[in-house]
Amino acid sequence: MHIVIMGCGRVGSALAQALEQQGHTVAVIDRDPTSFRRLGSSFGGRRVTGIGFDQDTLREAGIEEAGAFAAVSSGDNSNIIAARVAREMFGVENVAARIYDPRRAEVYQRLGIPTVATVRWTADQMLRRLLPSGAEPLWRDPTGGVQLAEVHTSSSWVGHKISRLQEETGVRVAFVTRLGEAILPSSQTVLQEGDLVHVMMRTDEVHKVEAAFAKGPEEEGGH
């Protein structure tokens, strides 16, 4: 996959290096050309000097072929504008933006842009939002038989209760991250757009659970 990153600070450079190591092609945009030194001499991706929400700059970075876009510059407004341009003008499927003001998170979330306050951001968290495939194990019991994992959830689960998700997938939802905050859901909690679902499940059932989460809820007769 080709991935475009706006911002070559600590998170942006770490993200670019991690993605390249995973076999993705990467382009990094920054208005300060000296910031590219953080990438190191071994980085083989594109270095594009410019403003990350400028359409010509984005095209130079290969946004038209990109499967993901990360806005991790030092400015909230620049990040959200760039994220919206990537999604709305270029149709990039996986988009995430870093913000510094957590009070803005809900507004951005309504725009369909995953955001989390910067104190919680790490390159690893951004990686999971850009490449939402498969379960990310966060904890395993000593025997290795049970694990806690963040599982990518199909958007078709939005609007359905946690109880239905648990019943159809056979997992227990441990907690949900919503607008950057962890919540302990009840069986009546309804999944919202942008929720990150963390579940307890048997390690030998990971692939089955991933498939059920990706498939979405079963069709209901007469529903």
UniProtKB/Swiss-Prot annotation:
* GO terms for cellular component: plasma membrane
Matches recorded under InterPro entries: K_uptake_TrkA, NAD(P)-bd_dom_sf, RCK_C, RCK_C_sf, RCK_N, Trk_Ktr_HKT_K-transport
Free-text domain note: The RCK N-terminal domain binds NAD and possibly other effectors. This is expected to cause a conformation change that regulates potassium transport.
Q: Name one GO molecular function term.
A: potassium ion transmembrane transporter activity
According to UniProt, the name of this protein is Trk system potassium uptake protein TrkA
Indicate which residues the UniProt annotation says bind NAD(+): 7-11, 30, 73-74, 98
Location of the RCK C-terminal domain: 133-215
The RCK N-terminal domain extends over: 1-118
**SUPFAM superfamilies linked:** NAD(P)-binding Rossmann-fold domains, TrkA C-terminal domain-like
Q: What does this protein do?
A: Part of a potassium transport system.
Superkingdom of this protein's organism: Bacteria
Record gene name: trkA
In its keyword annotation, does this UniProt entry include Transport?
yes
Please report the organism this UniProt entry assigns to the protein: Streptomyces coelicolor (strain ATCC BAA-471 / A3(2) / M145)
- What keywords tag this UniProt record? Ion transport, NAD, Potassium, Potassium transport, Transport
